[in-house]
């Protein structure tokens, strides 16, 4: 048992007097019950204003059997108010106010319903924040990603049908390059649509180690290059991913494999001459 806790459940056999809210207590609920053998007892739940030891609690509730609360606040309160063994009561004192449990699952569920940032739990759930702040940030990122993806809308363009027709047939060498020089053709919107509907991996380019580390074996890989990236396109990692074998040297060296990867590039420019063999590239004009 923890040496000092806030919330206690108690049983007091053969009580002689009613209980009242001590100044050190924040909330108290109890009722008179009859046990299986007919023993009359108080079954109760108490929340203290500060952490309290078992010795201190025994002074407040002489003769009571005390245990720290193991379930939720609501479960402990309900157990002290159950009807099946009730003789009299229940009696409540103080204000019952459910607070968030300092546990990772509870905090994650609260984040999902409230939209709070991890740092907002630093005071009320300090242990969880201290141990799992990175997990909470990652979880919030996934929530934000899901919310954003749900809002993405697509305005269909004819060239998109051509891309989907190409994807119907697997080709272990083909890289689909969607070329739209003017901008505004819907390239990025279509890339978002594929992320939303096909669990695609999306990248705007970068170093091989970073891209290989981020890629999680998705079978559809999308490169959506800004116009300013033309001189910095990493053609090597595009080809590695298409081959289904890519090496990541970020944090630790690892080789990732995938049986088949479809690669689609969206750009305002065509690939630089000589970077791919001619049979590699299928250009779709947006």
From Swiss-Prot:
Belongs to the nanoviridea/circoviridae replication-associated protein family. This is Master replication protein. A divalent metal cation binds at residues 33, 41, 84. A motif (Nuclear localization signal) lies at residues 50-70, 96-102. The active site is at 79 (for dna cleavage activity). A motif (RCR-1) lies at residues 9-12. It is found in: Host nucleus. InterPro entries: CRESS_DNA_REP, Helicase_SF3_ssDNA/RNA_vir. It comes from Subterranean clover stunt virus (strain F) (SCSV).
């Amino acid at each position: 048992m923890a040496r000092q806790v806030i919330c206690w459940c108690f049983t007091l056999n053969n009580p002689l007097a009613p209980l009242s809210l001590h100044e050190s207590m924040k909330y108290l609920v109890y009722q008179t019950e009859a046990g299986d053998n007919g023993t009359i007892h108080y079954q109760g739940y108490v929340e203290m204003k500060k952490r309290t030891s078992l010795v201190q609690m025994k002074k407040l509730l002489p003769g009571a059997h005390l245990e720290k609360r193991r379930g939720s606040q609501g479960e402990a309160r309900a157990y002290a108010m159950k009807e099946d063994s009730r003789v009299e009561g229940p009696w409540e004192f103080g204000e019952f106010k459910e607070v968030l449990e300092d546990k990772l699952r509870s905090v994650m569920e609260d984040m999902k319903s409230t939209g709070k940032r991890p740092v907002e739990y630093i005071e009320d759930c300090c242990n969880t924040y201290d141990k799992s702040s990175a997990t909470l940030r990652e979880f919030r990122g996934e929530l934000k990603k899901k919310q954003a993806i749900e809002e993405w809308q697509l305005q269909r363009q004819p060239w998109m049908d051509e891309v989907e027709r190409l994807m119907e047939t697997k080709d272990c060498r083909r890289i689909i390059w969607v070329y739209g020089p003017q901008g505004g053709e819907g390239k990025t919107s279509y890339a978002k649509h594929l992320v939303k509907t096909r669990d695609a991996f999306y990248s705007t380019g970068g170093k091989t180690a970073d891209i290989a580390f981020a890629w999680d074996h998705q079978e559809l890989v999308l490169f959506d290059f800004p116009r300013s990236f033309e001189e910095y396109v990493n053609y090597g990692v595009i080809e590695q991913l298409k081959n289904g074998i890519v090496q990541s040297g970020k944090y630790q060296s690892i080789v990732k494999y995938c049986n088949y990867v479809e690669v689609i590039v969206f750009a305002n420019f065509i690939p630089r001459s000589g970077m791919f063999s001619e049979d590699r590239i299928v250009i779709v004009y947006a």
